Amino acid sequence: MKTLILSCNTGGGHNTAGRALLEELNRRDLPAEMLDALSFGRKHTSRIVSQSYISVASVTPKLFGGIYHLGDFISSSHRKSPVYLANAHYAETLHRYIVENGFDTVLCPHLFPAEELTWARKKLGGTYKFYMVATDYTCIPFTEETEPDAFFIPHADLIPEYEEKGVPRDKLLVTGIPVSRRFPEHMEKAAARQALNLSRSAHICLMMTGSMGFGDILPLPEKLCAAEADVQVIVLTGSNAEMRKRLAERYGSSGRVIALPFTDRVADYMAACDVMLSKPGGLTSTEAAALNVPLIHTDPIPGCETRNAAFFQEHGMSLRATGTEEIAQTAASLLYNAPLQQAMIQAQAKTINAYAARDAIDLALERCSSPGV
C-alpha cells in the first residue's frame, strides 16, 4: 500500500491527525507522503485560504460561528455546495499527481481534499481508494456531499448524526481520531516533570491555546495562582508571539507562570500537569484523553468546537467553564478533587481509542488487499 495523506493548514488539528497517520505508516515501513491539498491550486491559494480562516476564527469567532451554522443549514446530500465547486478547480491536478506517483490509498483528515477527490473520481475515474478521516466529534457541514470509500469517524455514538445528514451507514467505520503514540505511551508524571525541569510538588495547571494561540487568557494565570500558593501555570501559546510577550511582561520571571512558544513536547507537558485547560479542538481534546489528563474546556470557537465540548461533557471526560472567574474557580476545584479527576480519567479511557491511527491504517490495509471492499 502506497499512501498519500492530504491535509490543509486551516487550524493545526487536521495536520496533527495527518502526521499521526504518517507516523503509523512509517512505523510499518510503508511508503507514504503528506501534502497540503491546497498546494495543488494556484500559487497563493493555500496561504490565502489558511490566513482567512485563522483571521475569521480568531478575530471574529461569532462571525465564524455564523458561517459554520449557515453551512450546516444549507448542507445537503442532494446538491453540491460552493465549497465543493471551489475545490473542484484544482482536483484534476491532484488526481494526476496521485495516478502518476502510484498511490493506491489516500487519507483525508480535512474536508477540502475529500471534496476534490469526489469530483476527480466522478469525472476522471481512478482505481485508488480514499478515506475521509473526521477530526471533530460531529458531522461537519458538507461531509455528506463527499463520496469516499469510507468515513473514519470518532465514536459509535455519532453514527445517527452522520446517517441523519445522509451518509450511508455501511460507509461509517468507527476508529477514533488519530493521535501520535506519544500520548498513550507517555512518561509518568514524575519523569515528565524532571525532564522538563518543573516542580515535583506544585499543582500544575497547563493552559493550551491551540496551534494559533486563540483566546484572551492574559488575566487567567493570576486568578489561578491566587487560588492556592502551590499552583504553577504553564501556558503553551502556540505561534502567538504577542500573547507570549504580554504574559512575560505581566508575570515576569517568578516561575509561577511560564509562557512557552510552539513546542513538539506537548505530550510531555500534558503528562507533567495535574489539570489542563484548553479550547475544545478535536485533536487537542483527543490527545488529552489519550493521555488521561483531567480536562476543562474553555470558550469554544462557535461551530464544531461547541459540539466537541458537548460530546466530552456528556461522556464525563471534561468539565466546561466560560469567563475568567468561572474558569479559575473550576480549575481550582478540580486541582484538589482527586475523586473527580479519577472519574474523568476512567471516562476518557472508556470512550476514547488512543490507538485510532493504528486502527485506521489496519482498515486501509485490509481494504487495499481486498479490491471488492
Describe these PLM feature segments.
Residues 313-316, 323-339:
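C-terminal "capping" alpha-helix adjacent to the active site of nucleotide-linked donor transferases
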Residues 189-194, 198-273:
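Donor-nucleotide binding loops and adjacent catalytic segments primarily
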Residues 20-100:
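Conserved N-terminal ligand/cofactor-binding loop architecture of enzyme catalytic domains
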Residues 149-204, 208-211:
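A nucleotide-sugar donor-handling region in carbohydrate enzymes
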